[in-house]
């Protein structure tokens, strides 16, 4: 039997689910009467989604559709970082929606401090863009998970490598 148990706290998303959500958004835009003739494009590139359309009103509609499709695919709304709306050529607007992945050092320190302050039998260590949490009891780890789910961090947290 293992002497200590651990899990990792990460901020990640399922890339394939995001691809599927963006494909559904594109299909939805082509099928909706109010968006058909707007020549709206939604493009998924490496670390962002680029949206180009004819007005800010249709851009808001695309945001709504994207949020709905992402939610249906169990993707957190916190992965989207909506950038500034830019004017493009010919009365068009475009926006880059960055995709947030990984836990920043600042947030990792907040998580680690919360664990140290509230749970004396649990250790937290920052490892790159993840936080490793370890304890002698699985029950302690489950309590930590429940506590972290109650907090509202600017990134989506997932718990992996439960050992």
UniProtKB/Swiss-Prot annotation:
A GO MF term: nucleotide binding
InterPro entries in UniProt: DUF520 (IPR007551), UPF0234-like_C (IPR035571), UPF0234_N (IPR035570), YajQ-like_sf (IPR036183)
Gene3D superfamilies tied to this protein: 3.30.70.860, YajQ-like, domain 2
Entry's Gene Ontology cellular component terms: cytosol
UniProt keyword annotation of Membrane present: no
Keywords: Nucleotide-binding
Membrane-spanning ranges: none
Keyword presence, Nucleotide-binding: yes
Function: Nucleotide-binding protein.
Listed name of the protein: Nucleotide-binding protein Npun_R4736
Organism: Nostoc punctiforme (strain ATCC 29133 / PCC 73102)
């Amino acid at each position: 039997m293992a002497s200590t148990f651990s899990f990792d706290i990460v901020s990640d998303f399922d890339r394939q689910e995001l691809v599927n959500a963006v494909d559904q958004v594109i299909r939805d835009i082509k099928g909706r009467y109010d968006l058909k003739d707007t020549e709206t494009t939604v493009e998924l590139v490496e670390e962002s989604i680029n949206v180009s359309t004819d007005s800010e009103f249709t851009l808001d509609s695309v945001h709504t559709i994207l949020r709905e499709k992402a939610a249906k695919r169990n993707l957190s709304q916190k992965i989207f970082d909506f950038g500034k709306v830019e004017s493009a050529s010919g009365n068009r607007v475009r926006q880059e929606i960055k995709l947030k992945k990984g836990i920043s050092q600042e947030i990792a320190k907040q998580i680690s401090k919360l664990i140290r302050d509230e749970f004396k039998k649990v250790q937290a260590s920052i490892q790159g863009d993840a936080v490793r949490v370890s304890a002698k009891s699985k029950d302690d780890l489950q309590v930590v998970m429940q506590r972290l789910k109650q907090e509202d961090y600017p990134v989506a947290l997932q718990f992996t490598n439960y050992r």
